[in-house]
Amino acid sequence: MLLAPGDVIKRSSEELKQRQIQINLVDWTESEGGKEDKTEPKEESKAEGSKDGEGTQSESGQKEEGGKETKDADVDRRIHTAVGSGSSTKGPGERANENADRGDGKVGGGGGDADAGVGATGTNGRRWVVLTEEIARAIESKYGTKIDVYRDEVPAQIIEVERSLQKELGISREGVAEQTERLRDLRRKEKNGTHAKAVERGGRKQRKESHGDAQREGVEEEKTSEEPARIGITIEGVMSQKKLLSMIGGVERKMAPIGARESAVMLVSNSIKDVMRATAYFTAPTGDPHWKEVAREASKKKNILAYTSTGGDAKTEFLRLFDHL
């Protein structure tokens, strides 16, 4: 039996269910009136875990992260910028986003070869990129698709991972903050015209090509209006896994369930009542207000294995324990 902080257990609940490991979680909720924290023990079995665990994880995650996220990370925000172009320009990225909001999941030009697992191609053959290394690693790990990180190149098509998808991918608070900072930098550069020269340089050739295509298709005005978005920077907000996969290609990796018998751990808990029967405990920076006391009691036990986070992603380090125990 392994003890761990409550928030680490919540973030890892899906993987624990796949391994058929039971969870005994003492949760805490803060009332709006500033009342004392309440605890509510919940034991998730194999059958019940798939319903209760996910709902609790989502609700608690929103409370923990909601207070520290800035307006730049709002779920409802959509940014579609064409650097060097007018604000009234409407490019293909906006129409793709509107379709996604209606629930059809269609994104213009967002194909990519799902089987290849190495590409993320957007409109006009350009590749979608993300803003941080952590997001790129999470996408590759979950969907098997390698995706590049934005390196200040122009033009570019950037995926902004929004709040609900951040949780799906297991992005840390530090990763969320890094993405927000890079978005601010992009806006600052756009305002100062940093990319304008590079955009203007490619504009003449693009306009000439677009004009020829428009004559052949009989839609010259539409081609001309879309052209600035193709030569600038487009930032596409993505909330759902379905939309992300339609943009980058790839499929969610379905791991075969790992039976509890393949791991020495049968149960994980953050309850102080389970200290006496615990054989190991894992500690990491946490928002679980009860964990400090649990860890203190666990450390008093003889012959208990103690594991401590090295400062990386606590969820990743926590799950690695099951491969070694």
Curated annotation (Swiss-Prot):
EC number(s): the record gives 3.6.4.13
Basic and acidic residues bias locations:
8-18, 32-54, 61-79, 92-105, 175-229
Disulphide bond pairs: none
For bias type Gly residues, the affected ranges are 106-122
Q: Where in the cell is it found?
A: Virion
Q: GO: which molecular function terms?
A: ATP binding; hydrolase activity; structural molecule activity
Binding of ATP occurs at: K106
Report the catalytic activity.
ATP + H2O = ADP + phosphate + H(+)
Q: ATP-binding among the record's keywords?
A: yes
| Superkingdom of this protein's organism | Viruses
Q: Where is this region: Disordered?
A: 1-126, 175-231
GO cellular component term, pick one? viral inner capsid
Q: Which UniProt keywords apply?
A: ATP-binding, Capsid protein, Hydrolase, Inner capsid protein, Nucleotide-binding, Virion
Enzyme class comes to hydrolase
Q: What is its main location?
A: virion
Q: What task does this protein carry out?
A: ATP dependent RNA helicase essential for RNA packaging and viral transcription. Possesses ss- and dsRNA-binding capacity.
| Complex and partners | Homohexamer.
Family assignment? Belongs to the orbivirus VP6 family.
Q: What is this protein called?
A: Helicase VP6-A
Name of the gene encoding the protein in the UniProt record: Segment-9
